[in-house]
UniProtKB/Swiss-Prot annotation:
Subunit structure: Homodimer.
EC number: 2.3.1.47
UniProt keyword annotation of Transferase present: yes
Keywords assigned: Biotin biosynthesis, Pyridoxal phosphate, Transferase
Coiled coil location: none
Upper taxonomic lineage: Bacteria, Bacillati, Bacillota, Bacilli, Bacillales
Protein name per UniProt: 8-amino-7-oxononanoate synthase
CDD domains from the UniProt entry: KBL_like (cd06454)
Pfam families noted in UniProt: Aminotran_1_2 (PF00155)
Amino acid sequence: MNDRFRRELQVIEEQGLTRKLRLFSTGNESEVVMNGKKFLLFSSNNYLGLATDSRLKKKATEGISKYGTGAGGSRLTTGNFDIHEQLESEIADFKKTEAAIVFSSGYLANVGVISSVMKAGDTIFSDAWNHASIIDGCRLSKAKTIVYEHADMVDLERKLRQSHGDGLKFIVTDGVFSMDGDIAPLPKIVELAKEYKAYIMIDDAHATGVLGNDGCGTADYFGLKDEIDFTVGTLSKAIGAEGGFVSTSSIAKNYLLNNARSFIFQTALSPSAIEAAREGISIIQNEPERRKQLLKNAQYLRLKLEESGFVMKEGETPIISLIIGGSHEAMQFSAKLLDEGVFIPAIRPPTVPKGSSRLRITVMATHTIEQLDMVISKIKKIGKEMGIV
C-alpha cells in the first residue's frame, strides 16, 4: 500500500499539485501570523470578520458554560438542546422560509439533501462548477446525474427537454460559485424549473450574509425567495461560526430529519458553535453597514486590478479570481506574494479545470483601504515581473 502512496504522491508532485498545511497562530483577521510570520490575509471566507468578533467569542463561551464543550450525542439521541431548535428557528426567519435544519457542516448538509431526496428513477441537473459536496451528494444518491455547462441556460434547457421519465427533476446550483465568485442565473433557472416541472436546490454558502436584503442570500437578491425548494448554507463563512443548514418547508425538514443519513448519524453541533452562529446572524441582520463595507471593498479591489491591466470577470461578490493558467506559474505567483507579506493561495486542479489555475482573492469587511492599496501594489508588481500584465 505504501508503495502505491509513494507512486501517486510522486505523480502529484510532478504535476505541481502537492498540497501542504500552513500553520496559523492567530484567527482569520485581515492580518495574521502564519508559520511564525505576519501576513496580510486575502484568502479567508471570514467575509464579515465575525469569526474573530468579541461578541461571538463571548456567546460561544457562554454556551460552553451552560451546556459543556460538546453535544454528547446525535440530535436524535441525547444531543438535541433547546439552542439547536432556537438556532433553526432563527435561520428560518433569516432565510424567510418555513423551517430550517442544522447539520454539522455545509458539506454534510449538501450530501444529506441530495442523497436522501433523490431516488432511483429521478434526475439531477447539476452545474459543472458546483461544489464538491454537491458532486458527492449526487454520487451517493441513486438518481441519474446530468451535468450542464457552467451557468449555460441553453444547455440546461436542452438537457431538461431531452430528459424523459416519471421521476423527480432536481436542478442543483451554487448561488455564488466558490472559485470565480459569479452568481448563478437564478431567474432563468426558476423559469426553466417551472416549464419542466423541476425542483430547485441552491448551495448558498458564499451568498449567505453577503447578498440580498440583510444578507439573506441569492434567492432574495433576485426577489425569488419563494421559488426555491431547498437552500443549503454554512455557518462557517460570513456568519463566523461553524456548521451547516438547510432552509426549506416544514415537511421537507421532517423528511430530512428522518432520512438524511448525514443528519441522523452525525454528532450534534457543539453549544459554542450554536451560540456563536446565533450571534453572527443577529449581527448580520442588525449591522447592514458591515455587509455594505464588504461589497465596497470588493468593488474597489476589482476595479483597481482591472485598471492595472488584469483581465477580471465582472462581479460584485467578495471572491475575485486572477486566472494565471499553469499550476507551476500560479504557485510561483503565490510564493512571490508570500515573500511580499501577502497570503493569497494558488488554486489548482482538481479544484479547477486544467489550464485555469488561479489566485483566489477574497475580501473582508475588515480590510482597511491601506491594506487594499498595499495588496493591489504588490499584485501589480509581481504581475509585471511575470509578464502577466
